[in-house]
Amino acid sequence: MHKTDIEIAHTAKKQHITEIAQKIGIAHENLIPYGHDKAKISSSYIKSLNNNPDGKLILVTAINPTPAGEGKTTTTVGLSDALNLIGKKTIATLREPSLGPCFGVKGGAAGGGYAQVIPMDDLNLHFTGDFHAITAAHNLLAAMIDNHIYWGNPLNIDPRRIVWKRVLDMNDRALRDIVISLGGITNGFPRQTGFDITVASEIMALLCLSENLENLTQRLKKIIVAYRHDKTPVTVADLNAEGAMAVLLKDAIQPNLVQTIENNPVLVHGGPFANIAHGCNSVIATKTALKLADYVVTEAGFGADLGAEKFFNIKCRQTGIVPNATVIVATIRALKMNGGVDKNNLTEENITALEKGAANLVRHIKNMALYGIPCVVAINHFDSDSDAEIRTLQKIVATTGHKALICKHWEQGGKGAVALAQELVTLIEKQDSDFKVLYQDDIPLVQKINCIITKLYGGRGAIISATILKQLESWEKEGFGTYPICMAKTPYSFSADPKQYGAPVDFEIPVREVRLCAGAGFIVVICGDVMTMPGLPHYPAAEKIHLDENDQIQGLS
């Protein structure tokens, strides 16, 4: 019987965080320790690295996720350990898990098996308090908006046009739509508003896109929180809130150093969702790792249609980061599910369903070619995978001109991904990245939306109401037309229908809402039924999480 992830994590032999730091040349005085096994890297030290050459960057992405699981974080960790095993100084850079899905569906997000980040329980829960700081900064701004109106509203804010909600790092559907300031005149002016989850906050996004604290402050100032009665925007700068917000975020902007089970360095920092935000860890963590290592392995959330697309078209576009290679993670089980097999029958050999479902993987491979980046497929191995299924999938991938390598890092750690590591090193040394973004800054916003849908998703285009079209045109006139698009849609399909598996074609994506994130520097396009405040499932993971008789946390996975 296999050990659980948390059992493996609890028996891992951790090294002191100063030892991990020494492996990548960081002296203990440049760390801000949080106990013995985690630390922040000081901003002053990061600044001193500016003249260091950059290492090579590998992005790990995946097919569209299914309940069968793909193992993207596990592969990121296993690949990083494997690269270190073959003598390449490597750092993995990941996002911080959110409490919401931790207690909801996932039960944790630190990798799995013998390819995990530790301390796993701390990482999945409060960690170093970054999310709490972001929540506090976001809600301070919300309080200052209502306070401004209470004390006479000199900015002439229209209470009906306040676009800044409050946030909480929890899945709580009851807070999606609420009325505040009830109870009489001493409590302010009643109005309808709601909560988003913290990882959907624009502050989370802009912190992860900021280059330093000064850049963070400038981005904060640009956030649009409301509109006046004459429909002109009200910003954070108008409320003089950026200083206090930056104070709350001054420690949160510093990346966190932890380790894998094999005692290799990992920077874990920031955590925007990929279905409702841009889905990448912080620019500061990525750039710091590139200055310290030969290779950096990072991931982008959900499938390549969401996380990788935003990594390329938002993160790389804004910061000048250039990836050298991409890994697409797939499992035979998930591809069979894409081919129509019920979740309960995925362990049975089914070549026909695999061939049908592999269309999802093939489309993702072809999409990577649009960005000009070398690509490898990692088949995350399960015991139920038959030899015939493995051969079939490798042949399908070979027809696209790419390789598919079996990876067993979940059960073997880094040595289970050595073949993948060696292939990537060879590929990067042999083939230069010819990276390019999907669309140019100067094309109209509607054209950018349709470009993503037609070129990447395989659809006909977007269904956009006259009201939303008018809003997009207005933003273009106000100077926001050069912003990239951040699509918010279901991660489970190329389409807006989460049940449309495989590689659907000839569909349209309904656009429900658009949001201008002037601080983060992108426009969110909300499609279909996607929610910015999730709810808990029928049987939340929280029901299985508890303390045992030794006060050890159990139930995280």
Swiss-Prot record:
Keywords: ATP-binding, Ligase, Nucleotide-binding, One-carbon metabolism
Catalytic activity: (6S)-5,6,7,8-tetrahydrofolate + formate + ATP = (6R)-10-formyltetrahydrofolate + ADP + phosphate
Gene3D superfamilies, alphabetized: Domain 2, N(10)-formyltetrahydrofolate synthetase, Formyltetrahydrofolate synthetase, domain 3, P-loop containing nucleotide triphosphate hydrolases
Binding site for ATP: 66-73
Top EC class for this record: ligase
A Pfam family of this chain: FTHFS
Pathway recorded for this protein: One-carbon metabolism; tetrahydrofolate interconversion
Top-rank taxon, per record: Bacteria
E.C. number(s) listed in UniProt: 6.3.4.3
Listed GO MF terms: ATP binding; formate-tetrahydrofolate ligase activity
NCBIfam families: PRK13505.1 (NF010030)
Family: Belongs to the formate--tetrahydrofolate ligase family.
Protein name: Formate--tetrahydrofolate ligase
Natural source organism: Bartonella tribocorum (strain CIP 105476 / IBS 506)
Gene: fhs
